[in-house]
Amino acid sequence: MVQCGFNTLVPALVFKLRIFALYPLGNLSTGGYWSNGNGIGVLTSVPGYSPVVNATSIHMDDFNVIHSGGPYTLDANGLVETDDGQVIGVHSHGLLANTPGVKAIMANRTDASPTRWGEIDTFTTWTFQASGKYSELTTATFVANIQLLPSDAEDTVSYINYRLSQVLPGPTCDDADGRGNEL
């Protein structure tokens, strides 16, 4: 099995958001329907991950495009404030599979059920802007798995949870020409 030269993933952060507003913006000339969602929530590190993060969102915006035959395109930006007063910029971009379960949650259907972790086969990439003891987040890249949960209150559109893993270099290849193990 080829292993050298491939990245590894380290569980790092969990971001739990409550989407409280979804604003329709209209059809795009390139296809799809554009909307903006606003959310609030918490960003925390998993046990053993450094830096330790315990933050609450100040503001989160997600400009998303819904394609009838394809996945949703997500593009979220926002700010979180840590429990020690540091502000961290957050950016996420990626896809959300347009499955029947996702459609039911997005349409706020009463029979909608939460998606299971691993059920959605698309992911998002995450980057951060931070300083001080959180500055190492700025030089890292993260990928996230997504879980959606339906609304349970009038002031909630849906819930979206992300499990972020930091992308790290995999083992180096030891052969002289740098190709590593043959595929």
State where each predicted segment sits.
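Beta-strand-enriched cores of mature, soluble protein domains
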Residues: V2-L183
